[in-house]
Amino acid sequence: LAGWYGVLAYILIDEFKLQKINNIDTLDYDPLAKNVGRILFAPKDAENIKGGKATFVNYKYKDIRKLKYDYLNKFSLVTCTSCEHLAQKDIDHVIDRLHSDTLVVLQSNNYKDCNQHINISNDINEFRSLYTDKLDNVRAYVKPFINYDRYMIIGTRRKK
């Protein structure tokens, strides 16, 4: 979700060694993100193809508020590294449509000086509490920076 040109998709392709990744969809509300991602990662795609590694990044222009269960239930991992840019009800909409035991990775921060940050949490406990009724086995992490803290939680979609 909020794919940021597919950066995380390419990190997963290069670094995730536990099992083969068959398919990665990177979703963005900005239709230009697909074009930027394709240009940005064209050399990486060429390198992967030359090296015999297929690239499975599907750029999707989608409004997450309209995602349906039949689309979301095919994924075993869903990430959003920019929760601060999304309304909480929209994040909840996605999580509510995931199948049980889907691995969910969410990141946010407490940086208040960006007018595009519409959904920040004051601390990791507040961020984590947003998902206590939706996720099980939650692990929480904080990365301090000079002007703000970055939060990450990892959990599995609670059984419905």
Each language-model region and where it sits:
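Conserved SAM-binding loop of SAM-dependent methyltransferases across substrates and taxa
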Residues: 5-19
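Conserved beta strand-loop-helix elements of the APE1-like EEP
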Residues: 154-159
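C-terminal substrate-binding/active-site "lid" region of AdoMet-derived donor-dependent transferases
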Residues: 87-151
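S-adenosyl-L-methionine
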Residues: 34-73
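Short beta-strand element of Class I
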Residues: 21-27
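Conserved SAM/SAH-binding beta-strand->alpha-helix loop
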Residues: 29-32
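Conserved beta-strand/loop positions that form the S-adenosyl-L-methionine
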Residues: 1-2
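A short SAM/SAH-binding and catalytic strip from SAM-dependent methyltransferases
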Residues: 74-89
